[in-house]
A protein has these predicted regions:
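Accessory "access/gating" subregions that flank catalytic or transport cores
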Residues: 2-123
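C-terminal catalytic subdomain
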Residues: 105-214
């Protein structure tokens, strides 16, 4: 892609000190240290396209969303979420407390946020795929194909990735904002956490193929 490390500079990261953004830029600098490609194309462009120079600013929030979801789910997995819950009393008896620890909004919102983060991550990946295959910006053979008279090169991979991105956009719609009244209006609010978790699982599955395509 003939990019530059200018946008990954420590000074740029320091004035917007989100830890995951800083770490992402540091990772990119470390991976590309002493790269002959970087040296060869130094000054090739005034600045890179957003899908290249904004990687820390997108990958950082995605990492944060994953960490936040992990922290939330760790609490959920070590919680008592039944209803009612039975507690011992000091007199040796027990009491049943009716509550709503069974509500799945924590897991649901975490899962919905994951869907959005995954979709954003793959959105940028798809943009880079296009830059790799588009000869007008890559300065490489169209669709990375030297024999255009005989086949379409990697065009079909981009089609597949774009189709998967469309599915991710659908899955990025938050499940927890939906509601249906049930149980004779006793359960007049339903958190839809299961649907959100299922969407997150499906999104991760689709994302693997998009990132592999890139």
């Amino acid at each position: 892609l003939k990019g530059t490390l200018m946008a990954m500079a420590e000074r740029l990261m320091a004035v917007r000190p989100h830890p995951d953004q800083i770490n992402t830029a540091a990772n990119i600098r470390a991976i590309l240290k002493d790269s002959p490609m970087l040296e060869r194309y130094r000054g090739h462009r005034v600045q890179d396209a957003l899908s290249i120079r904004c990687m820390p600013q997108l990958h950082g929030p995605v990492k944060k969303a994953v960490k936040d979801a992990q922290a939330t789910l760790a609490i959920e997995l070590n919680s008592s979420v039944d209803n009612p819950l039975i507690f011992d009393e000091e007199d040796g008896g027990a009491v049943a407390l009716m509550g709503c620890n069974a509500d799945g909004t924590y897991a649901g919102m975490a899962s919905d946020n994951l869907c959005i983060a995954i979709t954003d991550l793959c959105k940028m990946s798809n943009s880079r795929i296009d830059r790799l295959l588009n000869s007008l910006v890559s300065e490489l053979p169209a669709f990375l194909n030297k024999n255009a008279d005989f086949n379409n090169g990697l065009m079909m991979i981009q089609y597949a990735s774009a189709g998967l991105q469309g599915e991710l956009r659908i899955l990025a719609h938050p499940a927890v904002v939906d509601n249906l009244t049930t149980c004779a209006n006793q359960e007049d609010y339903v958190n839809m956490g299961y649907n959100a978790a299922k969407k997150a699982y499906d999104s991760m599955h689709l994302a693997k193929y998009i990132l592999a395509a890139e």
